[in-house]
Amino acid sequence: MQVYQCCEAIRIAYNQIGSGEQGYVPQAIAATIRALNAVASDERVPADLREQAAYAAANLLISDHEDA
């Protein structure tokens, strides 16, 4: 997925990080899993979205990608 395919909020954050306005998170995979976990565990979030977040987090945990 490319940044131009993402929602406006992601594109804004991407531009802020790229410009130095916001700090880069060096352990991005761990940060992503924490964010997905927060969504997956929040009962205020619709069940289908929580399931998507849980599936995405599980795939990251199983994948061979690691934070540098």
From Swiss-Prot:
| InterPro entries in the cross-refs | UPF0253
Which residues are in coiled coils?
none
Can you tell which superkingdom this protein's organism belongs to? Bacteria
TM stretches of this protein: none
Q: Which family does it belong to?
A: Belongs to the UPF0253 family.
- Cited HAMAP family: UPF0253 (MF_01064)
Specify the protein name. UPF0253 protein AHA_2115
Q: Which organism is it from?
A: Aeromonas hydrophila subsp. hydrophila (strain ATCC 7966 / DSM 30187 / BCRC 13018 / CCUG 14551 / JCM 1027 / KCTC 2358 / NCIMB 9240 / NCTC 8049)
